[in-house]
Amino acid sequence: MKNKVSEPSEAYQIISKYGNMTGNDQVLTLAAMKGLKTGLFSDVISLTGFSRDIVAGWLDISSKTLMNYEKQSKYLNPASTELLLKIILLFEKGLKVFGDRIHFTRWLKKPAYGLGGVIPIEIMRTSGGVDLISDELTRIEYGDLA
């Protein structure tokens, strides 16, 4: 199983795979309410390049539990589905702002001035945290760094 996106086109394939579920907040919420299979989890690992343990930590689920879900083809709960879909949107924006995954993930691991010195990856455990990071990316995109 691949764990990392090797080419930019592969990243955009993953992003476009979920594009019909992330068009707006209403569509995303309705998709999340249904839950998605654990393939979404694997796609987020591939897209982000982060380890299974890190991504599982965002969902507050152990890697072992997620492996069992994958074996049983279970669906993720609505909150986990929503968070992972928002992370896909976040990476779409991050790739646009930073140009590639390497620079974006490097930024995610360092204190962000616009977030009061918080390290972005540390607040990706909540939907609100992902929203704050997305807002910060918008400010960076438009040059509003103050």
PLM segments and residue spans:
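Non-transmembrane "mature" sequence context
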Residues: M1-A146
